[in-house]
Amino acid sequence: MKTPNILFLMSDEHRADVTGYEGNSVIRTPTLDWLAETGTVFRNAYTPSPICVPGRQCLMSGQLPKTVGCEGWVDLQSNHMTFARQLSRYAYETVSCGKLHHQGDDQMQGWTQRPAGDVHITSNHIANRSETHFQEYSRSFSTFKWSDAKEIKRAGVGSSPCVTRDRFWTDSALHFIDDFFNSAYYDREQGQKPLLLKVSLLQPHYPYQTDHDKFTYYLNRVVPYLDQSVFPHPFLSQRQVRPGTDVSEREIRRATAAYYGMVETIDSQYQEVLEALTHVGENLDEWIIVYTSDHGEMLGEHGIWEKQKFFEASVRVPLIIRYPERFEAKVIDQNVNLCDLFATLCHLAGIPCPSGLDSRTLVPLMEGCAENWANETVSQFGKTNLMIKKDHLKYQNYGVNGQEVLFDLYRDPSENQNFIDEPDYVESVSWFRQRLSQLGHGPNADPNYVNAGYTSDVRT
């Protein structure tokens, strides 16, 4: 079997249940539904951090925030090991079109080409920098920063920077595909290098704006989160937007409709990429196709918008891997993490995976062997806020003086009740607190913490 090409499709802020394949009867996502029907769906996939920069850099590095040292808006060290760098070392042409959100002077991080890059300037680029001056410089580029309820109020028909950039990045991917497989056919070496092509779009990240047709289609079909009880917790209740007070119910409906429209837009743009590959003669059944997002979107649930929380809407992400040459379509319920994609891609490509990662290959699950899977996953926000999910229980710790939270997703799938002090959960809470220390968090943190303790060596 030849070394497989890989298509890595990614979005920004896509909550997992706004997809047809998860049973949402309102949203139109035929492309993602096709991937799900013919691929492997991971129903309990979680981001390592429910915010863009750490989530994406952990995905690329196969390491959790504490391991990689990216617990906020910080740089990934130059020449850090990423799955793109590992694949390129083993002959892959690694090409990224769209958003990466890398910080620091190494804007490639293992990608051999970035036809339409998303370069982010940080203060670490500037010699003899002044942080104050840089903040003013950076602020001049911030044309759509979040500010309380502003994004909800201006939601509707429009063409935000996310919309225009996604169109540009999709077009760049289409041009690259034509050039790589078609235009260069007669002058490239025979036995061309295998390809890793990442197409990473900004939508459905706010601003909540979409085109007229999609907006009007969804406006009276969506069911917005209106009568939401706010969870009584100092962190989980932060940035509440109150229906009828901060924003009107109509404004919430408009923002929800626009969000759905953006999801449909990226679905159609992914279809363009798939059709382009088919047009140049590629058999998609021979490709590994991955789809995921960096985190979810609260969309008004619990009165909260955006992300940054450990509620399911924010921390759970869509994840599909399609490779019909090797795997039958199935749905997997085990807890997995975006960090696991590093080891998985190495395994599927038949190359070694570096040791010392917080990454576990998902291939055994895809093969139907779940007996030895440690059914837990981890997510971190900032330096002190940590979530550990074990089976159906989801524990959260918010630092030395923070209030602990325990959700039971079987008994309370809407996450309205904190079971942390319930007698039935004493043993579970004890286990979570011990695991918290093992992961280098909490008052009894293990000073020798290195990584999550997963075995990531994959030899094929």
Q: Residue locations for each model-derived region?
A:
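Formylglycine-dependent sulfatase
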Residues: M1-Q396, Q403-E404, P413-Q434, H441, ...
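Residues forming the ATP-binding cleft of Hanks-type serine/threonine protein kinase domains
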Residues: Y410
